[in-house]
Each structure stands twice: as structure tokens, then as C-alpha cells.
Amino acid sequence: MALRPSKGDGSAGRWDRGAGKADFNAKRKKKVAEIHQALNSDPIDLAALRRMAISEGGLLTDEIRCQVWPKLLNVNTSEPPPVSRKDLRDMSKDYQQVLLDVRRSLRRFPPGMPDEQREGLQEELIDIILLVLDRNPQLHYYQGYHDIVVTFLLVVGERLATSLVEKLSTHHLRDFMDPTMDNTKHILNYLMPIIDQVSPELHDFMQSAEVGTIFALSWLITWFGHVLMDFRHVVRLYDFFLACHPLMPIYFAAVIVLYREQEVLDCDCDMASVHHLLSQIPQDLPYETLISRAGDLFVQFPPSELAREAAAQQEAERTAASTFKDFELASTQQRPDMVLRQRFRGLLRPEARTKDVLTKPRTNRFVKLAVMGLTVALGAAALAVVKSALEWAPKFQLQLFP
């Protein structure tokens, strides 16, 4: 069964609506105090900061984010930031593409911002991107990367954004910055197994429509920055993602699809109709509810379980991309995700999977937050599941952008 849509204006839950002003202010004040207490602890209480970032309302203000985001990414703010070289624009092979993307990013800046200020920020955005790429030649620019960088720039400023983006690019975003889209494609392949765990009916409908997962590509590689119009919702998601496992964005993508289950099932069962519907992401989503449910699914169906299942399926059958001819056809028809089309249909589904997974007793909140944040606390080990999964997965030549 789906995550049923509920009425709401899409704001950040009870922090913005539904409670009296006095109650709201009291909760906010209490949370701010808890965040500062965690920051002032010796050593800093990172587990508490992760809980604050994940829990309802997130980190609340950009001022707090300037203090907490570096801690979540283990960036030492006392160290001098990287210094941009004046000749980078002349030397960088990516400069022209970065320039085009940044020029198209007008809507990512606050409405009403003076042109002069916006243009100055766009220049800073270009400098940050080129500097990170120059310092890390193993990284490759992709269209959509600027949508993530501009979020950090607007929240923490150029100096701190450079350090944060560099750390993020070598960790959470690392798979997106390979020479090809192979690893990105593999991460997208987690989407359908997650959906299948909650709603086999929706999963089978989408498989019959052969819609694939391309509709979620821009969600994943921009952390939803490219598709959400309200900057408050973007930074709220960044609070969540920075405090969690690198695969959490794909879980959030799954709960969006599940939330819209009835809309999808009411569509014509063909690729064009379903792709069009899912590509148009609603702006009034109940973000706090979806964040909580994404966390529930992560705990109930961790990446290691889904990765092994997907890997076994990939070994069991050939895919549309396994030969050049089939790959060419799949790319032309925008149906590249055939890896999980038949997921061991001979195996019996447990009875419980026909029920709504999310009707089970809710996971203890503190246990759930601890599990979601655990891999982040382990630093480089946070990517171990992803890396091991990629070792099992076959490689696909799939170039999605010009």
C-alpha cells in the first residue's frame, strides 16, 4: 500500500503550522538550546547534532547551519580555505559548461535579489566549482552539480562553502563524479527494490509501464535542489541528507513515489504517461512526514539488504544494456533501467509484504536516528556499503547528459 497523501501546504510540519504560537516558540527555543549544548560539549556531541538535523524542523536557521554543517562533514573551520587561482578559468576544460549552467541558475537565487548581488554570487559559484575540480582531478563535473554548490554558497558563503563542497564531493557525491554515469545508474537501481518492499502493486505497475528510474535522476544528483522551488525545503532536506547515509536521497525519492501511488496507478500504464507524471514533482509535499518515513524505510530495509538482492538479480538475467545494440535501443527510448525488471518472480513473497510496511509499530525514534547516523559517524566507512554494492554490479555504458 502507498504512503497515502494527506492534506497540507507542503511546509515543514508542525514547526510551521498546526501548533499554537507559544507552543511552537517553546519547541523551537528548546531545540536551539539543545543544538548549542551539543556544539559546546567537549568533545562536540556529533550524535546529538545528527539527531537535531534529522528530527522535525531540522537545523532551523542558516546561522545554525553555518555551525553544524561543518561538524556533520568533519570539516575543520579553523583551517584556511582553499585559495582560488586566477588562471583557473583559462585552464579548466569544464569552464564553458560550468558557465552555461550557472547562467541558467537564476531561479536558484532569492526572488528580488539585486542583479549586481546575484551576478557576484554567480561568479563565486563558478570559482568554487572550478577550484574543487582543480584540487581533485579524479572528480568530473556533471550538470546538476552547480545546483548543490549554490545551496551551500547561499547558506554559508563562499569561504566555508568551498571547504564543505570539497568534502561532500569526495564522499557523498563521489559516485556522481565519475567519468561515466555507471555508478549513478547503479544507485538509481535501489529505487525499485525499496518501492517493491512497501507496495508490490505499484512496483509491478511501474515495471509493466517500463518507466525506469530516469525521472528521479535530477532528484538524486542535485539532492532535489533542481526541482524544489522553495529554498526552505531544499535546506531542510540538506540537513537530513548531511546527517545520514549517502544513499538516503534515494530512499527519499522512493517515499515521494509511494506517496503518489494512487496518482500513478490511475495513469495509463505506459512509459510516457508515468514518466510525465513522476517528472512533475509536487511542491506541496508533506516534507517532515516523508523525511520520517524515509528514515523508517532505511532502518527496515537497509542498503546492504537491497544491494545484495539487486546484485543477485543482475547475475540471474541479462539486461537491455548488456549488448551495444540493446543498449542503443534502451537509450533511445529512455528506458535504460531494465536491471530489476524481473526480481525472482519464482520466489514467494512473504505475506507481510502485501501489507503496508509503514503500518507496523513505529521504530523507536532514538534508535532510528542512531541507525541513520551511524555510518556517518564512521567517516569513510559510511560509503562501505555503496562501494561493496558497486563491486557486485555490472557496468553499463550509459551517458545521460551531453
From Swiss-Prot:
Biological function: GTPase-activating protein specific for Rab1 and Rab2 small GTPase families for which it can accelerate the intrinsic GTP hydrolysis rate by more than five orders of magnitude. Also shows GAP activity for RAB18 GTPase. Promotes RAB18 dissociation from the endoplasmic reticulum (ER) membrane into the cytosol, probably through stimulating RAB18 GTP-hydrolysis. Involved in maintaining endoplasmic reticulum structure.
Protein name as catalogued: TBC1 domain family member 20
UniProt membrane topology term: Multi-pass membrane protein
Cellular component terms per the entry's GO annotation: endoplasmic reticulum membrane; Golgi membrane; nuclear membrane
Single biological process term from Gene Ontology: lipid droplet organization
Domain Rab-GAP TBC stretches: 59-245
Reported disease: Defects in Tbc1d20 are the cause of spontaneous autosomal recessive blind sterile (bs) phenotype. Bs animals exhibit embryonic non-progressive nuclear cataracts and spermatid abnormalities associated with male infertility.
